[in-house]
Structure formats: structure tokens, C-alpha cells
């Protein structure tokens, strides 16, 4: 929006023409918005009794969280949208693709949270309907970018740590994009089980995508680093920084002991947005490395289900795996910080892959 005012109202704020400045302003704006509105949202959430529903079969340490409000993802989404609309060039179609996923997946998460709170159970939206709506939005997203800009979704798969890192997979790419969107949103959702556990890996991952969006828009740098050239992708860096700032602002209230949880409205929206950005940048496989914590959590659930159905035995004492460590007696803050450390290391490994060959 500021770009529009600067161009057509002749305000002549040259600083707005520089991506790094707008990215920094975007981060700071979303951060301070959350710091300011966070306490108000938490107050009204408590007043409306939007408390987190605790599973009866969950870790006993979680019973102390039963009076902690959820749905904090609402003010995460608000601050991201505010900063994005304020600082991004809104004529850039990539921005609208990500915003559509942010709002669409956020709405599904909101309905899920609302049903949990209303009916006082941890089930919420039925699983089949949840995946149905997530899938519908994912396919609409894929079809729209395929129709409007065929260059965004080429059918080449970029494989990290390979000398020849682009492989033609034809229309399998559409299904890969679908699984990235739906999978990432649910992976973040599964990880969001401890205070601050999910939001910091989201921040790290978004920082990595920020760098790639900057590299991808320069044909010489992208060729040197073996990343896909994506024209005008630098605007995504501003949106990414809005996510980082919003995440840091939310962490202010979500760090142990949490005053608010993001809920499904936040985790599905953030996970879906990261998946969408990775698709636009052609970094679907690199996303798996960057978001290795989310992959680990998801695999732990899948293995637990398969093992119990086939062997009638559990691999972990409880899944997702962060609950396994809780049951083993490891303190929650230790689990959280250690997962953060692993997430940071995975980010660094993924960045090394850009010029490993």
C-alpha cells in the first residue's frame, strides 16, 4: 500500500524502493502490533472462555494449562496481513497467493478451534472434513498459479545436495505441491503441543525462505547458488519478515509458561503459508530439511499408528514425539529449547546445500 502511495501520490520516500528496508519495517511492525494487541486479545479470550481443551489421555503436566486461552493465531494472522498489505507491492501476484492460503487455512483452523471450545472436546472439526477443506483450498491454489502464471509451477523438481539438481517429474509436481501444502500445515499443527515449541522453528524456517526469495530474483545469484530463478520473488521476503515479526511477537506471550496458544487457526495458517512460499520458490524438498522438526513430529505419529495397528505395540510412549519425552520425565523447557537448537542446525544445513556442489 505504501508503494502505491509513494508512486501515485508522489510522496518520494526513496527508502520504500529498497526491499531490505521494507522487510525490516515489516518485521518490526508485525512484532510491535502483536506486543500491543496481544494483551487485549488474551483478556478477551479469557472473558469468552476460549480455553485450550486438554486431552484426558495427555501428559498429566498439561492439566495446569486448562485455563490458558487458545486461538492466538487470530492476532498472528492480523499482524501478518497488516504488515504485508502496508509494505508489499500489492500488484505482485505471489503475495496474494500466500495471503489466500493464510486466510483460507486460518479459517479452517478457526472452525476447528471453535468446535473444540463449543463442545468441550479435543476432536473439533471431523478429520475427514478438515482434510477435505484443506485439500479443496490446496487444489484451488495450485490451479490458480498454474493458470495465471505457468512459469511459477514448472514441472522440475529441485533436489538439494545434487550436482544436477533439477529433475523433470511432469504432472506429479501438482500432487507434490498438494502434499507440501496439506502436509506442512498439519505438521506445524502436530508440533504445536508445548509452549513455544512450534513458533520458533516456524521463525527459523521463514528466515531461510526469506534468503532464498532474495537469491531467486537475481538470475546471476540464483544460477551461482543452483536455485530456481523466480522473477519478482523478492516481495515474498517482505511477507516472510512479517511472519517472523509476528512470530516473535506471539512468542512473547507463548513462551513457557504460555499465556496463550496459537490454536489450529494459527498452526494451519502458518504451516500452509510456509508450504505455499516453498512451492512458489521451487524449494519443496529443501523445505523438508529446513522444517525437519515438523517432519520428525509427523513421522512419529505415522509410525505410532502403523506400529499399533500391525504389532499392537507403541514405538513411543506417546505421540507426537515431544509428548514421549515429556512422559519420560524431561522438563518441558528443556524439550522446547533442544527442539529449537535442532531446528536452527537444520536451517544451517539446508542453506549449505545451496552451494554444496
Swiss-Prot record:
Catalytic class of the enzyme: transferase
Leader peptide range in chain numbering: none
Keyword Transmembrane included in the entry's annotation: yes
EC number per UniProt: 2.7.8.13
Membrane topology of the entry: Multi-pass membrane protein
One GO-annotated biological process of the protein: cell wall organization
Cofactor dependency: Mg(2+)
Subcellular locations according to the entry: Cell inner membrane
MF (Gene Ontology): metal ion binding; phospho-N-acetylmuramoyl-pentapeptide-transferase activity; UDP-N-acetylmuramoyl-L-alanyl-D-glutamyl-meso-2,6-diaminopimelyl-D-alanyl-D-alanine:undecaprenyl-phosphate transferase activity
Keyword field: Cell cycle, Cell division, Cell inner membrane, Cell membrane, Cell shape, Cell wall biogenesis/degradation, Magnesium, Membrane, Metal-binding, Peptidoglycan synthesis, Transferase, Transmembrane, Transmembrane helix
One term under GO cellular component: plasma membrane
Pathway terms, separated by semicolons: Cell wall biogenesis; peptidoglycan biosynthesis
Principal cellular location given in the protein's record: membrane
Family: Belongs to the glycosyltransferase 4 family. MraY subfamily.
Protein name: Phospho-N-acetylmuramoyl-pentapeptide-transferase
Amino acid at each position: 500500500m505504501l508503494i502505491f502511495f509513494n508512486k501515485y501520490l508522489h510522496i518520494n520516500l526513496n527508502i520504500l524502493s529498497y526491499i531490505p528496508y521494507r522487510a525490516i519495517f515489516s518485521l518490526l511492525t508485525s512484532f510491535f502490533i502483536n506486543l500491543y494487541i496481544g494483551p487485549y486479545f488474551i483478556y478477551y479470550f479469557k472473558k469468552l472462555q476460549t480455553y485450550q481443551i486438554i486431552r484426558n489421555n495427555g501428559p498429566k503436566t498439561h492439566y495446569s494449562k486448562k485455563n490458558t486461552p487458545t486461538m492466538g493465531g487470530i492476532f498472528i494472522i492480523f499482524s501478518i496481513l497488516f504488515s504485508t498489505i502496508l509494505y508489499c507491492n500489492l500488484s505482485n501476484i505471489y503475495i496474494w497467493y500466500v495471503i489466500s492460503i493464510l486466510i483460507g487455512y486460518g479459517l479452517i483452523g478457526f472452525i476447528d478451534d471453535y468446535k473444540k471450545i463449543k463442545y468441550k472436546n479435543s476432536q473439533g472439526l471431523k478429520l475427514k472434513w478438515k482434510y477435505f477443506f484443506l485439500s479443496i483450498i490446496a487444489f484451488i491454489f495450485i490451479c490458480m498459479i498454474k493458470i495465471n502464471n505457468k512459469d511459477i509451477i514448472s514441472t522440475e523438481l529441485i533436489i538439494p545436495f545434487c550436482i544436477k539438481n533439477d529433475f523433470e517429474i511432469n504432472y506429479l509436481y501438482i500432487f507434490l505441491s498438494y502434499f507440501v501444502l496439506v502436509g506442512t500445515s498439519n505438521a506445524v499443527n502436530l508440533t504445536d503441543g508445548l509452549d513455544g515449541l512450534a513458533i520458533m522453528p516456524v521463525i527459523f524456517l521463514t528466515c531461510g525462505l526469506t534468503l532464498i526469495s532474495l537469491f531467486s530474483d537475481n538470475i546471476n545469484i540464483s544460477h551461482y547458488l543452483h536455485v530456481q530463478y523466480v522473477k519478482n520473488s523478492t516481495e515474498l521476503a517482505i511477507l516472510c519478515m512479517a511472519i517472523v515479526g509476528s512470530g516473535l511477537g506471539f512468542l512473547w506471550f507463548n513462551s513457557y509458561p504460555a499465556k496463550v496458544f496459537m490454536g489450529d487457526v494459527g498452526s494451519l495458517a502458518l504451516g500452509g503459508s510456509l508450504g505455499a512460499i516453498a512451492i512458489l520458490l521451487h524449494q519443496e524438498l529443501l523445505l523438508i530439511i529446513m522444517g525437519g522438526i515438523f517432519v520428525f513430529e509427523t513421522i512419529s505419529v505415522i509410525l505410532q499408528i502403523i506400529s499399533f495397528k500391525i504389532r499392537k505395540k507403541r514405538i513411543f510412549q506417546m505421540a507426537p514425539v515431544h509428548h514421549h519425552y515429556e512422559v519420560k520425565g524431561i522438563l518441558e523447557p528443556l524439550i522446547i529449547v533442544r527442539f529449537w537448537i535442532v531446528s536452527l542446525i537444520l536451517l544451517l544445513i539446508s542453506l549449505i546445500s545451496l552451494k554444496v556442489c
